[in-house]
Amino acid sequence: RDDPDDTDRASGSSQVSTVSDPSYAQARKLDVDIDKGVIRVSEKEGISQIQVNVQDTYNRTQCYMDEFTLKVKRESGRSRGNEAPRIEILIPAGYGLDKLSLDMGAAECTVLGVTTSKLEIDTGVGAITFSGTVNGDVEVETGVGDVTLNLTGSQDGYNYQVECGVGSIDVGAEHYTMLSHETHINNKAPYTMELECGVGNIAVNFDQIL
C-alpha cells in the first residue's frame, strides 16, 4: 500500500532541479555542508563541469561559488515533518579536485570514484562512504557517525594520527579503540591521515594489501 505522504510529496515542490553555472568550470574545491538528507557524489562521462541535482521540498539547499570553491550548503530549519533532501553532485570524469570537504550533520553521503588532493570529513550522526583516490592528506572526525574510506593505494602511503573514544577505528589490518591518548604512526610517508572518533566508527580500506 502506498504511503499517502509519498504522493503528496511527488505532487508538491520536490521536483529535481539541476544547478550548473559556467562559473563552476573554475571549481578546484568542493565543499558540501548538509544537515540531513541523502547525498551522492560521483564522476560522470560527457559533462565538462560540475553539475548538482537537487530535490529539496523546502528549497534550503544553496549552490554557489566562493572564489575557486563550489559550496553546496543546506541550513537546518524548523521544518514540519522530516522531509530530507536528495542531492546528487556529478563531477566530470578524470576531474581531480584540489580538496573535497564533507560536513554532514545527520546526512547520509556516498562518494564514488572521485579523485582529490585533500579530503576532509566531519560528521555528527551521519554515515559517509568515500571510495576513490586521495593524493594528499586526509582528516576525518566523527561523533557517533560511521565513516568508511575505500582508498586506492596502500596503508603505508600515509602517516597516521589516531584518536578514539569508545568507538572504533580500523585502518587496513590495524584496530584501535578506547585510546587514552592520540596515537601517532610514522611511516615516513608523504601524506598524513588524521582520524578522530567519538562513539562512532571509522574504517579505512586500501586496494593494495601490504
Task: Identify the function of each model-found stretch.
Residues S17, E45, Y64, E75-R80, ...:
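Short, surface-exposed interaction patches in beta-rich subdomains
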Residues G12, P22-Q26, T61-C63, I91-Y95, ...:
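N-terminal start-of-chain detector that recognizes signal peptides
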Residues D2-D8, D103, D122, A127, ...:
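Asp/Glu-rich intrinsically disordered low-complexity tracts
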Residues S13, V32-I34, N53-D56, L70-V72, ...:
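Short amphipathic alpha-helical surface micro-motifs
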Residues R28-L30, G37-I39, S48-I50, F68, ...:
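The right-handed parallel beta-helix/beta-solenoid scaffold, focusing on the short coil/turn
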Residues D2-K73, L90, C109-G113, L149-G153, ...:
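Short linear S-[DN]-x-LW-Φ motif typified by the pepsin-like aspartic protease active-site region
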Residues V16-T18, I87-I89, E108, A127, ...:
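A generic local structural motif
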Residues S42-E43, S79-Y95:
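Extended Gly/Ser/Thr-rich low-complexity repeat segments
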